[in-house]
Amino acid sequence: MFSLQKKALQHIYMTPENASQLTKDLLQHLGLYWNGPVIKMDTVVHLHNKIFSNRSVLKYALAKQANITIIKTLVLWVEPEYALAQALKHNRKDVLECIFSYHLTTPKYHHIMHLTSSQELFEFFHLFICKSKNYNARMECLLYAATLYNFPNILEKNREYIIRHSIGNTLFAIACKERHIHLIAWFVTAGVLDTYDDSTLFNTAFRLGDYSLLEVACDLPIIYPDYLIISMMQTAIQKNYFRFFKKLLTHFNIYRQIIITDAAYYNRRKILLLLLNQNVFNNFAILCALSAAIKGHASKKTLNLLISQLDSQMTVIDSVYYSIIKYNNIDCIPLLMQIKTFRLETLVSIAVHGDNIDIIAACKAFLPKDTLYHLVLKMAIISRNHKLFKLYTEKENPMYIFTTIKAIISNLVNYTVVQAVAIEYLREFHREKQLPIVPLLMVLAEHNYITKFKKACYAANMSDQKVKRALIKCLFIASQKNYCQIFKYCFGSLLKVLSKHERVKFFNSVVFAKKLASYYDHQNMIHLIDSLIERFRYLIKD
């Protein structure tokens, strides 16, 4: 048999005429299983009037378990890398030995090591291609390759070496990167890691978007700290990995306000629905989430979902209002009005304080004009926002603005300092617009601003009948509210400008004012009126 093989090898390079000596039976016996003569012609093989590439011939020979002697010749016809790759695929150690004997100085072929499924062949192949003379370097190279190409048996075999040389963490990182699930589990449970960072596997799973890695991390026999799981859940929300989030939620059952808040901020309605269906979040947590949704300009569907979960009697927290204003989210206002406790008045007040013109303008569609102007001007006065005050007063009817400010002053009766500021705004506006003096006199008398009242009277035309009638009304106001100084000043001013005929009517008014004072039991006012009547009776009689 050997002589026949030798003869075949001698004639395998012969010309077609001489190669005809290789009969069909002989070729079959040698293990080639081809018909006709075999002739090598550069990069192809001529066989029975058919042309085959050298690679296909070698591949076919290996697949058919051809005789090693023939294969030794065929491997010379192809490049070494291809020959090695085919030998690895077919788990032919003898062919590898043959190739390495031909190529004593081989380049690095680490990239084809994974083609074999045999652990023994993998190690044997690595023995030849790793040229380092240092034992540790060779071992680390082998273990790196075993991790890279998923050969757990090699790692288990060298477990003590991995522990002794502290290379477990490096290899573990490779296993995570390559998504070798079984290897990852082995690294964590085999005790080969120096310091296992709980976040490594989770971070790798998120970075690669690999759900199977996340499952491995969850199923490992490790007790993870809550802060890590919360952090991973936040990452899942940010990346919108619903499957990842659901796995973490169902596996660890961790519910925190920050989770629902993040889901609302990033507009993750599917995740929000999953969280809300658990019925573990109270109204305050949902309101905080609503505030975050407004901050993140979430969709109307997300806002409606959160609003629908709120108790109708739950008071809207300030952060909701501040989020609308700070992040200028106008679109959410109509939706928030579904909440019974949502107050546009509060929103406008905060918007004025924050000088947010857009929000104030948006509220025009939902509030009556009187209410809106009352709120805006009131807050502009309180915050001394001259710019906003001017913006809302310069184009409006002056008397309408005057009446509005008058109402604001009346509402501030218990806030003396703020009321004084409002009075100053009113006087300044009155001066700029050159309005009639009478309404101003009435307001100053109503709120007992004696000094400003005297100044207004000094500027008024006291001979004007309207001014006279206004001062008489101020008498009644003063007697009703026990403003003795206002009464005394009005009394004296009127006596100076009234005619004899008018003084009689004036006396009747003073008598009526006394009756008002008696009705309200203002003893000081009664004594004052009596003394004034007694003192100036002669003027009335004349």
UniProtKB/Swiss-Prot annotation:
Coiled coil: none annotated. Pfam families: DUF249. Induction: Expressed in the early phase of the viral replicative cycle. InterPro entries: MGF_505 (IPR004858). Keywords: Early protein. The keyword Metal-binding does not apply. Plays a role in virus cell tropism, and may be required for efficient virus replication in macrophages. Belongs to the asfivirus MGF 505 family. This is Protein MGF 505-11L. It comes from African swine fever virus (strain Badajoz 1971 Vero-adapted) (Ba71V). The lineage of its organism: Viruses, Varidnaviria, Bamfordvirae, Nucleocytoviricota, Pokkesviricetes.
